[in-house]
Every structure is written in structure tokens, then in C-alpha cells.
Amino acid sequence: MMYDLFMFVLNFLLLIICVLISVAFLTLMERKVLGYIHIRKGPNKVGFLGIPQPFSDAIKLFCKEQPIPFMSNYFLYYFSPVFNLMLSLLIWVIFPYLTYMCSFPYGFYFLCCTSLSVYTFMIAGWSSNSNYALLGSLRSVAQTISYEVSLALILLSLIILIGSFNMLYFMNFQLYCWFIVFSFPLALSFFGSSLAETNRTPFDFAEGESELVSGFNIEYSTGGFTLIFLAEYSSIIFMSMLFSLIFLGGDFYSFYFFFKLSLVSFFFVWVRGTLPRFRYDKLMYLAWKSYLPLSLNFLFFFIGLSVMFFSII
């Protein structure tokens, strides 16, 4: 029993370290890709091809001074970025392992973590006691809650298809045909919902530079800003992993799975470099009038398929 617990903790710690390192290289990839989209080089001065750039940025961030907003709620102001990063790392528990001691059979757990992360945005904006931060946090809360509904329905429809909450089953059921082949509209809506869930372009209303300066994290610098930054980018990697697992075969023990994960992460960056920001009413219309009916139709269709299949048997 103690051995199983020790192995679980050790494997989870290794996974978290790998996620944090991959966040550093995702930021480097984003800056390189955006550089080539802007017809420039991107970071290439620090070390070989600019590879140590994210680590030097991290050192620079942590060496900065931490200002304390005079009218802020001190404890909540400092605690919310920590809680945000903790949730975005705990969410990786559902990453499927082939070993028994690390298998986590509850796939809907990630929805609990994403729902709780809404509170961190809200508390961060409110405790900063800044109008810009409060407006950014309110936008983020409305946006995240709206798109979580379609995310939950998409995941539920595919879980009904495989008949289990265990993410391991997605690999077994996609041996001969990927789910993206017969549910391509569902995959597109899942990707769009992931963009909105992680506050990325074209849904970056929580961080609209022209309106809210930096959004809910405007009063944070050094450590607090770094933790929010790490949480956002680890969520991007997690959503890319989930997309690859659910729609692109889910063969997570092979090299191709991580290649597909990197490709989906590249699409996150590519969308940022090419698409303009949506209007806020169009964002809500897209969630409630496009994604929600689509995911509900697929849900009823897959339920009907399951009932018909089991009645034939």
C-alpha cells in the first residue's frame, strides 16, 4: 500500500516537473511562431537559437520588486494565483497511465478543476481593488461558465460512446478509427471551447489590452504574475493533451501522441497570430446558440446509437 502511494506521488511529481518545463518551451515556441507570423526572427540572442530565453525571463521576473496595492485584500490577493496554479496542475491527475497505481478513472474530474478555477479569477480581480481587474475577472467568469457547458456536453457524449469515465478507454476505442472522423464538428467546437476556456485569442476578453490593460492580473507582478502565467500555459498544454486523447487516437504511450499534442498547441499559437478579437455579444452567441445546440444534438445522437446497439444485442 505504501509502495503504491509512493509510486503515485513520485510519478505525479515527475509529470508536474515535465509540464512546467514544457510550459517554458511552449512560451518559446509561441514567441518564435508569432515572430515568423510578423516576418521577424523572434528571440534568438540568448544561448543557442534563443533556447534558454524562457529561463532567463523567469529569473528576471522573480528578481523584480513586488508592490503591495494599498487598498487590496492582502491574503486573498496573494493566495488566488497559488490556488490557480495548484488547480491547473492537479488537473493532470486524469492523464492516463498504463500502470495501476497511477490510473485515475474519473474523467469528469477535470470539469471540477476548471469550474473551481473560475473562483480564482474572480477573487484575483476583486481582491486587487482595481476597476480594470474587476471588469476583467467578471468577463472571465461569464466566458468560462458559458463554454464549460458545451465542454461538459461534448465530453459526456463521447463518454456515452465508450461507456466509461476512464480516459484509458479512449485509446482502446480508437484503434481502428479516430473519433474526429465521424465527429468533426464536435472536435471543432471542443477546440473553440478550449480557446475560450483558456482565455486565448480570439476570446481574450479578460485580457483585452485596448480596454482593460492586462485584465484581472493587472495588479500582479513578479511571483503572482508568474504563477498566473504558468497556470494559463499549463491549461493550454492540458487542453491540447485532452484533444489529442479524445479525438486523435489517444495512443499516449507512443511518440506520435506527443507530436499531436505539440501540433494542437501550435494551433493555439497560430490562432493568436491570425485571428482578431471577437465582439463580446458574438462570443456569447457562439456559446449558447452554436456550440450548445451542436453538442446537445451529438449527445442525443450518441445516446440513441447506444440504446439501439444494446437493444439489438
Swiss-Prot record:
Source lineage: Eukaryota, Metazoa, Ecdysozoa, Arthropoda, Hexapoda
Coiled coil: none
Record-level GO BP terms: aerobic respiration
MF-aspect GO terms: NADH dehydrogenase (ubiquinone) activity
Keywords: Electron transport, Membrane, Mitochondrion, Mitochondrion inner membrane, NAD, Respiratory chain, Translocase, Transmembrane, Transmembrane helix, Transport, Ubiquinone
Enzyme type, top EC level: translocase
Family (UniProt): Belongs to the complex I subunit 1 family.
Transmembrane regions: 5-25, 75-95, 104-124, 151-171, 175-195, 227-247, 251-271, 293-313
Catalytic activity reported: a ubiquinone + NADH + 5 H(+)(in) = a ubiquinol + NAD(+) + 4 H(+)(out)
GO cellular component terms given for this protein: mitochondrial inner membrane
Entry membrane topology: Multi-pass membrane protein
Protein name: NADH-ubiquinone oxidoreductase chain 1
Record gene name: ND1
PANTHER family in the cross-refs: NADH DEHYDROGENASE SUBUNIT 1, NADH-UBIQUINONE OXIDOREDUCTASE CHAIN 1
Localization (cell): Mitochondrion inner membrane
